[in-house]
């Protein structure tokens, strides 16, 4: 895989509000650090630094504080990751100016609809996270975020019996609408986080 014009691999994580993007980051980043990788994290939001502040606290002692940044898009979340990713690209440049040793930057989108996708100048590899609680029918709605991402993550599998979602149906529908891999996760107990990690490493670091 050819990377963006920057000398660092970039992974975009998108998905609706409440799907578990921040929880997935929380699970992935310490594992990446344990494997000896230098990681930066960018959290996009419309008007606040809320997610970035949460991640700085969670990654204290794991990731240097200046490698966790918030980008306030001031507009629809997809604008900052697709139509005009300049603020995110500038933040990556800022990371690299102070930390040229960086191996990987993870970019979390603000919560958005099923149409959100990443500009290829921003993300070498993209994950799209949906939650079981959003409804069993989400995969078959064929949103570009679901269909076009490199890896679809179906999160919060522990909630399936409580919301009447059939995971087998979701898996079947997801495989019907997309050619890429699908992983079912529960970030609370880190079910299949290792599988997500393997896809990220194989898809962007060792491609």
From Swiss-Prot:
Primary location recorded for the protein, binned into one broad class: cytoplasm
Compartment(s) where it occurs, according to its Swiss-Prot or TrEMBL record: Cytoplasm
Any GO CC annotation of this UniProt entry: cytoplasm
Key words of the record: Chaperone, Cytoplasm, GTP-binding, Nickel insertion, Nucleotide-binding, Plasmid
Name of one Pfam family that matches: cobW
Record GO terms (molecular function): GTP binding; GTPase activity; nickel cation binding
Cited InterPro entries: CobW/HypB/UreG_nucleotide-bd, P-loop_NTPase, UreG
SUPFAM superfamilies membership: P-loop containing nucleoside triphosphate hydrolases
Gene3D superfamilies named in the record: P-loop containing nucleotide triphosphate hydrolases
Example of a GO biological process term: urea catabolic process
Residues annotated to bind GTP: 15-22
HAMAP family linked to this entry: UreG
Family: Belongs to the SIMIBI class G3E GTPase family. UreG subfamily.
Quaternary state and interactors: Homodimer. UreD, UreF and UreG form a complex that acts as a GTP-hydrolysis-dependent molecular chaperone, activating the urease apoprotein by helping to assemble the nickel containing metallocenter of UreC. The UreE protein probably delivers the nickel.
Protein task: Facilitates the functional incorporation of the urease nickel metallocenter. This process requires GTP hydrolysis, probably effectuated by UreG.
Name of this chain's protein: Urease accessory protein UreG
The species this protein was found in: Haloarcula marismortui (strain ATCC 43049 / DSM 3752 / JCM 8966 / VKM B-1809)
Gene: ureG
């Amino acid at each position: 895989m050819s990377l963006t014009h920057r000398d660092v691999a970039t992974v975009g994580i998108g998905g609706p509000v409440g799907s578990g993007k921040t929880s997935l980051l929380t699970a992935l980043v310490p594992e990446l650090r344990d494997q000896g990788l230098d990681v930066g994290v960018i959290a996009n939001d419309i008007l606040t630094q809320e997610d970035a502040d949460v991640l700085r606290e969670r990654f204290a002692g794991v990731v240097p504080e200046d490698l966790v940044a918030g980008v306030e898009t001031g507009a629809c979340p997809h604008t900052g990751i697709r139509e005009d990713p300049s603020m995110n690209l500038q933040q990556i440049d800022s990371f690299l100016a102070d930390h040229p040793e960086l191996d990987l930057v993870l970019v979390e989108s603000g919560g958005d609809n099923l149409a959100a996708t990443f500009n290829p100048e921003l993300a070498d590899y993209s994950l799209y996270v949906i939650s079981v609680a959003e409804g069993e029918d989400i995969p078959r709605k064929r949103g570009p975020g679901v269909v076009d991402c490199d890896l679809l993550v179906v999160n919060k599998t522990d909630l399936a019996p409580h919301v009447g979602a059939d995971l087998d149906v979701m898996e079947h529908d997801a495989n019907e609408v997309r050619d890429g891999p699908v992983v079912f996760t529960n970030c609370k107990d880190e079910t299949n986080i290792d599988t997500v990690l393997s896809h990220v490493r194989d898809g962007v670091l060792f491609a």
